[in-house]
């Protein structure tokens, strides 16, 4: 998901990135 491409987003929502 596009969140995973954004470092701060991936840190806030770690479960979204495989």
Curated annotation (Swiss-Prot):
Any one GO molecular function term: toxin activity
Localization of this protein: Secreted
Distribution of this protein across tissues and organs: Expressed by the venom duct.
Keywords carried by this UniProt record: Disulfide bond, Secreted, Toxin
Chief location: secreted
One cellular-component annotation, GO: extracellular region
Disulfide pairings: 3-9, 4-17
Domain comment quoted from the record: The cysteine framework is I (CC-C-C). Alpha4/7 pattern.
Protein name as annotated: Conotoxin pc1A
Organism annotation: Conus pictus
């Amino acid at each position: 998901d596009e969140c995973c491409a954004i470092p701060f987003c991936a840190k806030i929502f770690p479960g979204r990135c495989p």
